[in-house]
């Protein structure tokens, strides 16, 4: 009885299975014929997976581009409720079925591929454009920043030049007004500076001539300097400018900045004239009284003493200018400024005193640049001085074995430190101001 019931159930299942296999596609009939156990789900699983079998090629059609879509191979899909997923087993297909399916799949995938390709291309293109745009933006910003962005110093320089271009006319107008107000003082200073330059250059020329100097030229320099000094002091006698030479205040109602420069400038030029006049007297002395080789030391002492005295003259004038006429209004500020001025001035005076001390020490000591040369050494040297191009007079030989006249050598070493021929160091002492020159520095403080 149990066998009969089991046989009837199997017959019903076979009939039901045969009715289901008559209406399914060839691919499914083939797969179910190979695996009849997959029909247990009563046809529910395969109906839901019909549309999903074509979706995998459609998803990747956007990335494939223009490549032909490959047919999705036939296989067996098993439903699994315990695992929560589907298992796909690929199965080979025949040529006819593959050809027909590829034709149908190509038409179906062409529509879906167009949609997915357009969407994927739009999405991928926008991403690439965004990345490329950022890259180009950064590159363009880098290109613009290198040559286009000026350095801070260059921008400040351009701003200064622009400001000067705009303000230059007003600056010139202001300078023209100041020059017109002080035209007399500017003219006097230019004249005295020209006189100093002429007298200084002429004196140096006479010093270089040694015994051949012209006494008449020296007297002319003395007369020229004395005439200029007397003319200036007489023209402005009402101001008593000579009082500043003996540390007194000139006769001025007020002492502003331009008045201070005027008094200090005139006093400095007068002291320079006196310095040149003293040097002219040294040049005019004959060889019997003072040797030519010793005159350079006296020029040095006179110059150092003159610079020290010139630095002392402006002190009392600057004190009066800093304190002002009514010192009670700015007593604290004036006191601070005087202390600062005194501190700075003390360093300058100490330097001048040190230079004068070295000059006096050099004057009191005899300096030998070499030893007397013998007749044989003079003959080997050519019997002619390389400096004056004449026969040797009181020849001296240096450590480098070069022979020169004593006066020529002393005059040369008053300006240089090395041998005239081999440039080896011959002396390491003060050599400034030994040629009769006077400092052109304007001592205004």
UniProtKB/Swiss-Prot annotation:
Xref: Gene3D superfamilies: Zinc/RING finger domain, C3HC4 (zinc finger)
GO BP terms, alphabetized: positive regulation of ERAD pathway
Subcellular location: Membrane
Extracellular-side segments: 1-183, 237-256, 352-445
Gene Ontology cellular-component annotations: membrane
Organism superkingdom: Eukaryota
UniProt key word Transmembrane: yes
Transmembrane segments: 184-203, 216-236, 257-277, 331-351
Keyword Membrane: yes
Residues covered by region (Disordered): 12-41
Induction data: Expression is induced by IL3 and inhibited by LPS.
GO MF term list: ubiquitin protein ligase activity; zinc ion binding
Cited Pfam families: zf-C3HC4_2
Topology versus the membrane: Multi-pass membrane protein
UniProt cross-references to SMART domains, sorted A to Z: RING (SM00184)
Keywords, comma-separated and alphabetical: Membrane, Metal-binding, Transmembrane, Transmembrane helix, Ubl conjugation pathway, Zinc, Zinc-finger
Function description: E3 ubiquitin-protein ligase that negatively regulates IL3-dependent cellular responses through IL3RA ubiquitination and degradation by the proteasome, having an anti-inflammatory effect.
Annotated protein name in UniProt: RING finger and transmembrane domain-containing protein 2
Source organism (scientific name): Mus musculus
Name of the gene encoding the protein in the UniProt record: Rnft2
């Amino acid at each position: 009885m149990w066998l009969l019931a089991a046989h009837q159930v199997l017959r019903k299942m076979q009939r039901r299975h045969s009715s289901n296999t008559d209406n399914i596609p060839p691919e499914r009939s083939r797969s179910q014929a190979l695996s009849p156990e997959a029909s247990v789900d009563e046809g529910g699983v395969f109906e839901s997976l019909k549309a999903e079998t074509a979706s995998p090629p459609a998803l990747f059609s956007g990335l494939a581009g223009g490549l032909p879509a490959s047919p999705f191979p036939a296989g067996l899909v098993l439903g699994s409720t315990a695992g929560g997923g589907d298992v796909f087993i690929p199965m080979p297909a025949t040529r006819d079925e593959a050809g027909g399916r590829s034709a149908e799949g190509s038409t179906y995938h062409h529509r879906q591929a167009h949609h997915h390709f357009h969407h994927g291309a739009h999405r991928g293109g926008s991403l690439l454009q965004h990345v490329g745009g950022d890259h180009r933006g950064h590159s363009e910003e880098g290109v613009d920043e290198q040559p286009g962005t000026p350095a801070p110093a260059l921008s400040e320089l351009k701003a200064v030049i622009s400001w000067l271009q705009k303000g230059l006319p007003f600056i010139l107008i202001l300078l023209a007004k100041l020059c017109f107000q002080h035209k007399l003082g500017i003219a006097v200073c230019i004249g005295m500076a020209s006189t100093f330059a002429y007298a200084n250059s002429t004196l140096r020329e006479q010093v270089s001539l040694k015994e051949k100097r012209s006494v008449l030229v020296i007297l002319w320099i003395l007369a020229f300097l004395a005439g200029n000094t007397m003319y200036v002091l007489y023209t402005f006698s009402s101001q008593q400018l000579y009082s500043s030479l003996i540390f007194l205040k000139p006769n001025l109602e007020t002492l502003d900045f331009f008045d201070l420069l005027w008094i200090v400038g005139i006093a400095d030029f007068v002291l320079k004239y006196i310095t040149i006049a003293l040097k002219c007297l040294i040049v005019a002395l004959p060889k019997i009284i003072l040797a030519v080789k010793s005159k350079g030391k006296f020029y040095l002492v006179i110059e150092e003493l003159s610079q020290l005295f010139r630095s002392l003259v402006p002190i009392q004038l600057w004190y009066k200018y800093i304190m002002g006429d009514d010192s009670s209004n700015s007593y604290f500020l004036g006191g601070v400024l005087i202390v600062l001025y005194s501190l700075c001035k003390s360093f300058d005076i100490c330097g001048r005193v040190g230079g004068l001390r070295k000059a006096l020490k050099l004057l009191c000591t005899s300096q030998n640049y070499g030893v007397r040369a013998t007749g044989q050494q003079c003959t080997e040297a050519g019997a002619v001085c390389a400096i004056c191009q004449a026969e040797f007079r009181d020849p001296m030989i240096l450590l480098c074995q070069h022979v020169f006249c004593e006066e020529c050598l002393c005059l040369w070493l008053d300006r240089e430190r090395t041998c005239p021929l081999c440039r080896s160091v011959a002396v390491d002492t003060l050599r400034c101001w030994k040629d009769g020159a006077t400092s052109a520095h304007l001592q205004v403080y």
